[in-house]
Structures are given as C-alpha cells and as structure tokens.
C-alpha cells in the first residue's frame, strides 16, 4: 500500500504506530515534559521497529505533526517455502507476494510455517510481514 498520514504528536498513544527514520514502528512509551515558563511542551517518543525490532526514539514538540503508517492487515495462504523466502497468496485479490524469511516473518511464526496454511500478514510502506498463523 505504501500510504501514510500526518498526526499531531499530542494525539499519539502507546500501542499506536509512527514512522521514525523511514521505518514503521510501534510506540512503546511517550513522555511529555514542559521545559519552562515560555517554552512549548516536548514529547519523547520511544518506539520499536515493526520489521527490524530496533528501539528508536525521537523528541518533538507536542504541536508538531509526524508521519503515521497506514497498515493493511490481510489474510493469505502460504503457497511455497524456499530457504530464504515464503510465497503467499492474498485470499481476496489472489495476488502473489514473495516475503523474505529473515525480515518478513515473525520469530514465533517461522517454525509453524508450512505450505497450505492460512496466515495473517501486514502490508505497509511497500513491505510485507507475516504476523501470525490462522486456524486452518
């Protein structure tokens, strides 16, 4: 999909998503501090990357706007598994996607993958990650 939108920093909450350094991240913690009598409040946002798991943090004024990814949560079926990729087919559009196992599959899901099972995957900013295995 690759879509993103702008949201004011004061509207963000833990558990929501934000784009930091071009990487979609899940917000873990937000700390707001007012610097003094004439300064504007600043928010320190700590987040974990969806695809790489790295912790990132930014400091922004609460009145600033930041990019928020639009995450498309979809269901697909595993068609084929190679040593470094998983091929999935979307259950609604029947499009095929090649997902790299290293970055595109959650660690808990890697050992459960087999051909023919149904999975939930997230698509955002042109990247795909398999999040969980659905009941068969």
From Swiss-Prot:
Localization in the cell: Cytoplasm
Protein's UniProt keywords contain Nucleotide-binding: no
GO molecular function: ribosome binding; RNA binding; translation elongation factor activity; translation initiation factor activity
InterPro entries according to UniProt: IF5A-like, IF5A-like_N, NA-bd_OB-fold, Rib_uL2_dom2, Trans_elong_IF5A_hypusine_site, Transl_elong_IF5A_arc, Transl_elong_IF5A_C, Translation_prot_SH3-like_sf
GO biological process terms, semicolon-separated: positive regulation of translational elongation; positive regulation of translational termination
Record's keyword terms, sorted: Cytoplasm, Hypusine, Initiation factor, Protein biosynthesis
GO annotation, cellular component aspect: cytoplasm
Record-linked PROSITE patterns: IF5A_HYPUSINE (PS00302)
CDD domains with a match to the protein in the record: S1_aIF5A (cd04467)
Keyword Cytoplasm: yes
Modified residues (Hypusine): 37
Protein role: Functions by promoting the formation of the first peptide bond.
Entry similarity comment: Belongs to the eIF-5A family.
Protein's recorded name: Translation initiation factor 5A
Organism: Thermococcus gammatolerans (strain DSM 15229 / JCM 11827 / EJ3)
Underlying gene: eIF5A
């Amino acid at each position: 999909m690759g879509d993103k939108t702008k949201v004011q920093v004061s509207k963000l909450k833990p558990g929501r998503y934000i784009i930091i350094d071009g990487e979609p991240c899940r917000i873990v913690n937000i700390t707001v501090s007012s610097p003094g009598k004439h300064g504007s409040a600043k928010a320190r946002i700590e987040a974990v990357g969806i695809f790489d798991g790295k912790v990132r943090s930014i400091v922004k004024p609460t009145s600033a706007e930041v990019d928020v990814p639009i995450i498309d949560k979809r269901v697909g079926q595993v068609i084929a598994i190679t040593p470094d990729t998983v091929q999935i087919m979307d259950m609604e559009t029947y499009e095929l996607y090649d997902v790299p196992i290293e970055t595109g599959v959650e660690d808990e899901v890697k050992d459960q993958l087999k051909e023919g099972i149904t999975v939930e995957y997230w698509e955002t900013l042109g990247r795909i990650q398999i999040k969980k295995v659905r009941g068969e």
